């Protein structure tokens, strides 16, 4: 079959069946194309769209240190953490972090997200119930908001007066797809792709789908121009003069899970990226302590490497 004769979806349906929830259907597609597109779009929406979320919570300036502590609310500490964590938040362009603060005193009342004090560039996009305040004693709740991509696990449950939270940054909270049979004329060997998307309201489902499709398109752009490739254009390997050990992934150092997660949190993937960091730079990374530093130095030493190494002509786009 000629490439120009391959089917493209001409029947596209959009069913917004609930708030922030939409089902898209595309037909007809060549057999197998439905699964390929569905899987790529799902993974991209869940793990590659940037967003913001609450990453840590401090109660009464860090004096509340346990989920069992008593606070002047009908809810438990765990309830409040879950309610604050569920806040759908956005950060303005150029703003990487923000703070949400609730300062409660006086008579009893029900507290909602609209009563929060927000740092500049931070917004809460939907009203969320926080707690039923019993009055009397003061209660202060502070939440840190960060931008990010994908999922970042908390390295500790509690540190420096803060409850640390697993961070799910994507505004897409659910995405799945189903492939059904489709028919065009006499052809019955075709796919129908049904894509089910739910978001937290920070972006609508159509925008999430559009962002994912654009990201996939950008990833493929460098291999789309077959004509240029056929001209035999030679691109010099930017890594040809670099020690092959430096191009290996840090996983090959066999670090402990804690040290590995610390490096992932600051996007250090290759040994070459790691050795160019100084001790002070690593110690500034979230949850990175001297024990992890010692372990990394020992592992690098076994390979004849050390931190603070300058690598000339290190490619920035590996």
Curated annotation (Swiss-Prot):
Residue span of region Alpha C-terminal domain (alpha-CTD): 242-318
Classification of source organism: Bacteria, Pseudomonadati, Pseudomonadota, Gammaproteobacteria, Thiotrichales
Keywords, ordered alphabetically: DNA-directed RNA polymerase, Nucleotidyltransferase, Transcription, Transferase
Catalytic activity: RNA(n) + a ribonucleoside 5'-triphosphate = RNA(n+1) + diphosphate
Any single Pfam family the record assigns to this protein: RNA_pol_L
Protein name: DNA-directed RNA polymerase subunit alpha 2
BP terms from Gene Ontology: DNA-templated transcription
Subunit field text: Homodimer. The RNAP catalytic core consists of 2 alpha, 1 beta, 1 beta' and 1 omega subunit. When a sigma factor is associated with the core the holoenzyme is formed, which can initiate transcription.
Function: DNA-dependent RNA polymerase catalyzes the transcription of DNA into RNA using the four ribonucleoside triphosphates as substrates.
InterPro entries reported in the protein's UniProt record: DNA-dir_RNA_pol_insert (IPR011262), DNA-dir_RNA_pol_RpoA/D/Rpb3 (IPR011263), DNA-dir_RpoA (IPR011773), RBP11-like (IPR036603), RNAP_asu_C (IPR011260), RNApol_insert_sf (IPR036643)
GO cellular component: cytoplasm; DNA-directed RNA polymerase complex
A Gene Ontology molecular function term of the record: DNA-directed RNA polymerase activity
Protein family: Belongs to the RNA polymerase alpha chain family.
Gene designation per UniProt: rpoA2
UniProt keyword annotation of Cell division present: no
Species: Francisella tularensis subsp. tularensis (strain SCHU S4 / Schu 4)
Domain notes: The N-terminal domain is essential for RNAP assembly and basal transcription, whereas the C-terminal domain is involved in interaction with transcriptional regulators and with upstream promoter elements.
Region feature (Alpha N-terminal domain (alpha-NTD)): 1-227
EC number: 2.7.7.6
SMART domains per the UniProt record, alphabetical: RPOLD
């Amino acid at each position: 079959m000629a490439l120009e004769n391959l089917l493209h979806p001409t029947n596209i349906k959009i069913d917004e069946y609930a708030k922030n929830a939409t089902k898209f259907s595309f037909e007809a597609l060549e057999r197998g194309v439905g699964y390929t597109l569905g899987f790529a779009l799902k993974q991209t929406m869940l793990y590659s769209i940037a967003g913001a979320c609450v990453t840590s919570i401090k109660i009464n300036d860090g004096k509340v240190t346990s989920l069992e502590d008593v606070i002047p609310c009908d809810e438990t500490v765990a309830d409040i953490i879950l309610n604050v964590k569920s806040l759908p938040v956005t950060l303005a362009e150029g703003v990487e972090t923000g703070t949400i603060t609730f300062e409660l005193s006086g008579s009893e009342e029900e507290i909602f997200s609209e009563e929060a004090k927000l740092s500049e560039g931070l917004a809460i996009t939907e009203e969320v119930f926080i707690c039923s305040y019993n009055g009397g004693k003061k209660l202060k709740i502070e939440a840190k908001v960060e931008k990010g991509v994908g999922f970042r696990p908390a390295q500790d449950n509690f540190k420096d007066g803060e409850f640390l939270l697993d961070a799910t940054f994507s505004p897409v909270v659910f995405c799945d797809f189903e492939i059904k049979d489709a028919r065009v004329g006499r052809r019955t060997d075709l796919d129908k792709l049904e894509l089910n998307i739910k978001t937290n309201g920070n972006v609508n489902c159509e925008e999430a789908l559009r962002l994912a499709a654009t990201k996939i398109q950008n990833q493929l752009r460098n291999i789309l121009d077959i004509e240029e490739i056929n001209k035999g254009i030679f691109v010099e390997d930017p890594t040809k003069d670099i020690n092959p050990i430096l191009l290996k992934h840090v996983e090959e150092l066999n670090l402990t899970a804690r040290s590995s997660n610390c490096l992932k949190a600051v996007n250090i993937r290759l040994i070459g990226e790691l050795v160019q960091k100084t001790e002070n730079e690593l110690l500034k990374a979230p949850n990175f302590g001297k024990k992890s530093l010692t372990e990394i130095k020992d592992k690098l030493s076994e390979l004849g490497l050390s931190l603070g190494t300058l690598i000339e002509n290190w490619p920035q786009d590996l």
